[in-house]
Curated annotation (Swiss-Prot):
Residues 3-91 form the CS domain. It comes from Mus musculus (Mouse). PANTHER family: PROTEIN PTGES3L-RELATED, TELOMERASE-BINDING PROTEIN P23 HSP90 CO-CHAPERONE. GO terms for molecular function: Hsp90 protein binding. The gene is Ptges3l. InterPro entries: CS_dom (IPR007052), HSP20-like_chaperone (IPR008978), p23-like (IPR045250). Belongs to the p23/wos2 family. This is Putative protein PTGES3L.
Length: 131
């Protein structure tokens, strides 16, 4: 069976870019965050292999980036190399794959956003027990 991309949502913050790979009941999860790309793979609840490789719009700090798995998705928070520089898109190339969408539920203006961003990162870090 041929692998397919996972539906992916993303949003931008002053220090981080957040990505959510929307896969329920995932198994065999692998997330590799490098300075210029992320490689994600897993199997969904039906055993279908999912694979995404994303070349980032800009360089990231892979050593200060994390991922968190839940029953419904795998979320990555990727530390930007240059903070407070807006990313107009997630990908290096100016293309929009059908599986990639902006997460408008979490997208907001940056003004006064540092505390919100810190709270999100701390929430994921605290909830690390089920990784």
């Amino acid at each position: 069976m041929e692998r397919q991309p996972a539906r992916t949502l993303w949003y931008d913050r002053p220090k981080y870019v957040f990505m959510e790979f929307c896969v329920e009941d995932s198994t065999d999860v692998s997330v590799l965050i490098e300075d210029h790309r992320v490689v994600f793979s897993c199997r969904n609840g039906d055993g279908v292999e999912l694979y995404n490789e994303i070349e980032f719009y800009a360089k990231v700090n892979s050593k200060d980036s994390q991922d968190k798995r839940s029953g419904r998705s795998i979320t990555c928070f990727v530390r930007k190399w240059k903070e407070k520089v807006a990313w107009p898109r997630l990908t290096k190339e100016d293309i929009k794959p059908v599986w990639l969408s902006v997460d408008f539920d979490n997208w907001r203006d940056w003004e006064g956003d540092d505390e919100v961003e810190l709270a999100q990162v701390e929430h994921y870090a605290e909830d690390d027990s089920d990784s």
